[in-house]
């Protein structure tokens, strides 16, 4: 187990201009399984035929690399082959510092979709929003471009510029945005004390420094305000990160030795249980990074804020705190990525990222495809979030892994029906807008999380204060 924890472990979604997801496990299932010789012979014959007859010469390395990528990516949305550059970028991202635009992206309908602009990044300052579709990178169309190539095109030297062509579904318009690349330093833990002695703790991603940084911030908060009466853990737009980070964050608020998450897959080493013990969450620290956290944080009334972009490691934390009834979950149903990916280094500095297990909350529930449902569904905007139906969750992903505990067909059908209804409603609404209203919407930005205009946060504060909370009326919640 200790050897496992020394390995590269992360759980996330998407590519963060770019990188992805995972948990490192150390064994291979069915090592003694017989090789499918006939199928391998067919592969060899196809390779030879291409080399002999293709219209132009093609390098062996390119042909075989593309074959491996196709083989792995056909499994599910999260398995992929990482070449030298991809693997290096993944390792760079977990350190919390990289160069680029600062957006988490995925692929949808042949184009690139923005999952989340990283806070205080060039992309966020340029006004990019979750759900925006990127159709062109400078003069190059994105359709037909691999996600890896799109990521590499967007990354670059700090100070250089790139123009993205954006299609925003909610406004039915396309427009160019020129962004200057910069070194992205992701501050994963942000805190402040709100009115009425309530602490707001925002975690943007789970990185190497997240647990010790959280411990430091919690200690500072307790010293600043000895009269604290509640804490709000904000996991909105958090696409995941290091597994140890998720275990450590949950451990800060749960009893010692509490089960945080378990994983189960085909191999023996994929069957693991992660508890609230230092050995399970410390990375580079000699002792327990949570040792100095005031005991009050184990008992304070607590709310966890989530939305459709809270995924993977975020869902582990929310699911654990919900199962133990340690916190009330407020917001929207989470993304629903309940699978574990192994990053296994290969030769030539490449790696294989492959789904090896499902993960389960302490009660044994799988959130795969369904996500973590909030105890109190609340909209991000006071007047509702009709555009939420356009958000792609795990269950909408092509080739997503099915949840073995629950039937998905009805939910998929209901979501598709609601999506069609909302698209029609949006089109009708946009058709009635005046030019002035359309121009005003172009300049409208979503409220900054943690600001005075953050409606969902205001409802979390109301809940802790014992005041009424405006529940979402969405049929999907």
Predicted regions and their residues:
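Flexible, low-complexity junctional segments that flank or bridge functional domains
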Residues: 1-231, 235-239, 243-245, 252-255, ...
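C-terminal "post-core" interaction segments
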Residues: 4-5, 21-22, 189-477
């Amino acid at each position: 187990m200790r050897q496992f924890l020394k390995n590269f472990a992360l759980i996330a979604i998407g590519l963060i201009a770019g990188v992805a997801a995972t948990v490192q496990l150390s064994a291979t299932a069915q090592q003694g399984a017989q090789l499918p010789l006939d199928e391998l012979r067919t592969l060899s014959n196809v390779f030879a035929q291409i080399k002999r007859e293709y219209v132009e010469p093609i390098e062996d390395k390119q042909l075989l690399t593309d074959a491996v990528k196709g083989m792995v990516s056909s499994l599910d949305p999260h398995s992929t082959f990482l070449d030298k550059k991809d693997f290096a970028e993944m390792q760079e991202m977990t350190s919390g510092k990289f160069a680029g635009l600062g957006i988490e992206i995925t692929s949808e309908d042949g184009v690139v979709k923005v999952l989340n602009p990283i806070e205080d990044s060039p992309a966020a300052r340029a006004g990019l929003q979750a759900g925006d579709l990127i159709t062109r990178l400078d003069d190059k169309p994105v359709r037909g471009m691999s996600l890896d190539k799109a990521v590499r095109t967007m990354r670059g030297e700090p100070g250089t510029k790139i123009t993205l062509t954006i299609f925003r579904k909610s406004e039915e318009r396309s427009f160019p945005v020129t962004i200057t690349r910069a070194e992205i330093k992701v501050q994963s833990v942000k805190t402040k004390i709100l009115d009425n002695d309530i602490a707001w703790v925002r975690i943007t991603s789970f990185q190497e420094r997240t647990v010790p940084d959280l411990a430091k911030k919690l200690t500072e908060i307790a010293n600043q305000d000895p009269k604290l009466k509640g804490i709000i853990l904000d996991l909105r737009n958090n696409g995941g990160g290091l597994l140890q980070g998720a275990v450590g964050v949950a451990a800060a608020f749960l009893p010692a030795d509490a089960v945080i998450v378990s994983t189960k897959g085909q191999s023996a080493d994929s069957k693991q249980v992660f508890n609230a013990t230092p050995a399970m969450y410390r990375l580079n620290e000699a002792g327990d990074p949570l040792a100095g956290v005031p005991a009050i944080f184990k008992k304070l009334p607590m709310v966890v804020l989530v939305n459709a972009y809270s995924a993977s490691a975020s869902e582990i934390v929310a699911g654990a705190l919900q199962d133990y009834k340690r916190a009330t979950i407020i917001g929207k149903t989470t993304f629903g990525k309940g699978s574990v990916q192994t990053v296994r280094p290969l030769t030539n500095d490449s790696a294989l990222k492959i789904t090896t297990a499902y993960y389960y909350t302490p009660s044994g529930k799988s959130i795969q495809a369904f996500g973590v449902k909030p105890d109190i569904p609340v909209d991000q905007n006071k007047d509702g979030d009709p555009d939420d139906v356009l958000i792609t969750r795990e269950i909408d992903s092509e080739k997503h892994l099915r949840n073995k505990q629950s039937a998905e067909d009805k939910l998929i059908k209901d979501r598709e029906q609601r999506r069609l209804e909302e698209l029609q409603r949006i089109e009708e609404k946009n058709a009635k807008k005046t030019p002035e209203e359309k121009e005003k919407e172009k300049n409208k930005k979503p409220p900054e999380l943690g600001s005075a205009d953050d409606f969902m946060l205001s409802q979390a504060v109301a809940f802790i204060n014992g005041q009424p909370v405006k529940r979402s009326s969405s049929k999907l919640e």
